[in-house]
Regions:
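Periplasmic/cell-envelope proteins involved in peptidoglycan metabolism and beta-lactam response
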Residues: 1-184, 191, 200, 276-284, ...
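Beta-lactam-recognizing serine transpeptidase/beta-lactamase-like catalytic domain environment
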Residues: 61-62, 163-204, 210-446, 465, ...
Length: 470
């Protein structure tokens, strides 16, 4: 009897080892198969379609499904206009939009980064081939609204929660439907370009938020400085001048200059600051630094002052660089800058992924708010807020005024040469809503429009303030 029990114990042990080895082999083979399919996919739409046939879902923070797999087919938001508005963020399974959730979160959606024990548990439960589900920080209603606001423009909208860094809406125009990308038809010029993340725009007068912060924190400069604005006359040889107000603003101090967006004042201020100090404050706000959004890549905003002379420095100080100088900003970064001012000078790390869960509902990732850059002192941010409120209430940003809302912001216009060699003027607005219940920062860039960014931004904030945001 004892011999029988020993034999039974040995047989049981061998069986357990055999099953463990078999499961390990299955895990390795499954992982290898996924990797081989991914490597072989390249531009092969049909291979990618197979890979994504069991991929996890992508949902908005308010529970609307933006992408999911159903009976071996990858499907996108049921509301076609929402699917269109979400194209640049969600992407599609063909990876023609390489900087999208479908591509940069591929491992999570396919579940290919799981450990052996995690995969074993799912295999035993019968859902080992299913990917993980992702919940994004964006709100479906805000995404849809942003898409509608951009319908008649070329440009971008970014809306953030400035206390958490959560991305609430991101939209670009032009755009197309996901199925058009999959079928590769009806693709209009520029419709696949993610302007919000990849756009390198001249900041125009929105850069004056940075030069003002530098002035407020410069102990040797007089914040009560006055400058006589002579309109279209250059402040120094080859230097900044008024392009939209040729008659000039007269003698102005900081508040009036900020309200009227006076190039003469801020050109003189840039010269007084000098390249090193101007550059340092810009870098405090994230220029020449990496800005991340989860797994997404974002174009680095640049402030590279190579052109010699005071004239070039004065133009850089008003966001319209000349010669070898480079000053660019992405809409995503512009919204984060506005949010930093709203958040007492602290820029929060931007988030796009709220939560990741496996097929059994276990939470694998949950977003935590994190401070990113200390941009300026809290008292500097408070003074900037007063100046930005003045811009909206009685200055260049009056189009952003809305009854019952306290909106602070800064307008910008930037001249650029298009592909046809013609001068176009882009319209920019960066601002935020002063509200405990809706801490919202927004950036709008409209190409070839010199006025409407403030209107679009305020419409976005007004709508966002009217709904409950999870």
């Amino acid at each position: 009897m004892k011999q029988f029990l020993r034999n039974l114990k040995m047989a049981t042990t061998l069986l357990v080892l055999f099953v463990a080895v078999l499961l390990a082999a299955l895990f390795v083979q499954q992982k290898r198969s996924t990797e081989e399919l991914s490597a072989a996919a390249g531009e092969n739409k049909y291979t990618l379609q197979q890979i994504y046939s069991r991929a996890g879902s992508i949902s908005s923070s308010d529970g609307v499904v933006l992408a999911h797999s159903d009976e071996g087919e990858r499907k996108y938001a049921e509301n076609s206009e929402l699917a269109r508005a979400c194209l640049h963020l969600v992407g599609d399974y063909t990876h023609r939009l390489t900087n999208s959730v479908e591509s940069v979160y591929m491992q999570e959606l396919l579940g290919s980064s799981r450990s052996f024990l995690e995969q074993l548990k799912l295999d035993l439960s019968g859902c080992g081939f299913e990917g993980n589900d992702l919940t994004l920080t964006v709100n479906s209603n805000l995404m849809l609204k942003a898409g509608k606001l951009l319908k008649n423009y070329r440009g971008s909208i970014v809306l953030l929660n400035y206390e958490t860094g959560d991305l609430l809406a991101l939209a670009n125009s032009p755009t197309v439907y996901p199925q058009d990308v999959i079928n590769w038809e009806n693709i209009t010029d520029g419709s696949l370009f993610n302007r919000a993340l990849y756009g390198r725009y001249l900041p125009g007068s929105t850069i004056k938020m940075i030069t003002t912060a530098a002035l407020l924190e410069a102990p040797d400069l007089d914040i009560d400085m006055k400058v006589k604005c002579l309109g279209s006359k250059e402040i120094v040889p080859a230097g900044a001048r008024e392009t939209l107000t040729p008659e000039g603003h007269g003698t102005v101090g900081l508040q009036e200059a900020f309200r009227k967006s006076c190039n003469a004042f801020f050109g003189k201020l840039a010269i007084a600051l000098g390249r090193e100090r101007f550059n340092e404050k810009a870098e405090n706000f994230g220029f020449n630094q990496d800005l991340v959004l989860g797994n997404f890549k974002i174009a680095q905003s640049r402030l590279d002052l190579q052109e010699p002379g005071q004239g070039a420095l004065s133009w850089a100080g008003v966001g319209q660089p000349i010669g070898q100088d480079k000053v660019t900003v992405s809409p995503m970064h512009l919204a984060a800058i506005a949010g930093a001012i709203a958040n007492d000078g602290v820029m929060m790390k931007p988030n796009v992924l709220l939560q990741e869960t496996d097929p059994l509902g276990a939470v694998k990732y949950s977003r935590e708010a994190e401070e990113y850059y200390s941009c300026c002192r809290s008292d500097t941010a408070a003074e900037l807020e007063e100046l930005m409120l003045d811009v909206v209430n009685s200055g260049t940003g009056k189009r952003a005024r809305r009854d019952g809302l306290k909106i602070a912001g800064k307008t910008g216009t930037a001249e650029m040469t298009n592909d046809d060699g013609k001068i176009e003027v882009n319209s920019l607005f960066a601002g935020y809503l002063i509200s405990d219940s809706h801490p919202l920062a927004v950036a709008v860039v409209l190409e070839g429009e010199n006025r409407d960014a403030a209107t679009v931004a305020a419409d976005m904030l007004q709508y966002a303030a009217s709904i409950a945001i999870p």
